[in-house]
Amino acid sequence: MISHHVIGTLIQAYFTIFHVTYPLIHEETFKAQCHGTRSRPYQRSWDTLFYAVLGVGAWCLDNEDNAFDERLYRRALFLGEDESIFETANLSLVQALLLLSNLSQKRNKPNTGWNCLGLAKRMASSLGLHRELSEWNISPFQREMRRRVWWSLYMFDSSASTTFGRATLLPGREVMDVSYVSNVSDEVGYLLPRLCNIG
């Protein structure tokens, strides 16, 4: 069992260090889901995402407790092995797989990372994240989060392909019509009003 204090420290490390480069999770939403003040997506997917965030947070702290880091990483992977979570693609699971892919590479497990990235790509395509889908009736906030996840996936895939000399998994720009992410902050009360004025 991990104490609330340690969980808070790991989540803060994730958002302070990792999130500034890869803003694929909305900080205030994630923290509200952690505290139970906002509903969580499909439980198993969210649990996988939760432990992936903790694992990346532990890695960001760069402490010498590799056993703890490894335990969090393995817990997230274990939750991701439940085949029922693969029956329905969802944004939380794509986010979790992206984090697991990145963390696997950091842990010198490039093949595991590559395979997690492949699963994330297929789920993202199933969800249509590569398309703007302007006819969909979703909020500007939801649309922005879809863009963030897609372009984070794009960056991870490009980086992994270059690093390992493997073919990119993603389609070329001619197949994608998703817009780039908006340059807005995740601060409370800032992202949503700004996105409501876009367009």
Task: Describe each region flagged by the PLM.
Residues 1-92, 97-109, 136-141:
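C-terminal transcriptional activation/regulatory domains of eukaryotic transcription factors
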Residues 13, 36, 74-79, 124-199:
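Fungal transcription factor middle regulatory core
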Residues 96-99, 116-120, 149-152:
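Extended, hydrophobic/aromatic-rich amphipathic alpha-helical segments that build helical scaffolds
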